[in-house]
Amino acid sequence: MFKLAIILAFLFLGARAVRDGYPILKNGCSCTCQPLLENPKCGAICKSKVGISKAYCYMWACRLILHRYSEEYRPY
């Protein structure tokens, strides 16, 4: 029972981290956003986030871009 509780807690926290944009997955959004600084939008966002690790910044930038894209082009 204790092991199950630990596993469920880990899955919950992992899902929350993915939702919030933390870099817990190695490839995160590599299929939807070009490598860091090769994409002008990612580069501009990441340069403004001084002091944050590149992995976090990359994930955050990709999630932000995807969110804006989905809001802008959502079919009604």
UniProtKB/Swiss-Prot annotation:
Cleaved signal peptide residues: 1-17
Disulfide bonds: none
Reported modifications of this chain: Contains 3 disulfide bonds.
UniProt KW Secreted keyword: yes
Coiled coil spans: none
Protein name, as recorded: Putative sodium channel toxin Ts36
Molecular function (Gene Ontology), one example: sodium channel regulator activity
Tissues in which the protein is found: Expressed by the venom gland.
Subcellular compartments: Secreted
GO cellular-component term (any): extracellular region
Organism superkingdom: Eukaryota
Principal subcellular localization: secreted
Keywords per UniProt: Disulfide bond, Ion channel impairing toxin, Neurotoxin, Secreted, Signal, Toxin, Voltage-gated sodium channel impairing toxin
Record function comment: Putative sodium channel toxin.
Originating species: Tityus serrulatus
Family membership noted in the UniProt record: Belongs to the long (3 C-C) scorpion toxin superfamily. Sodium channel inhibitor family.
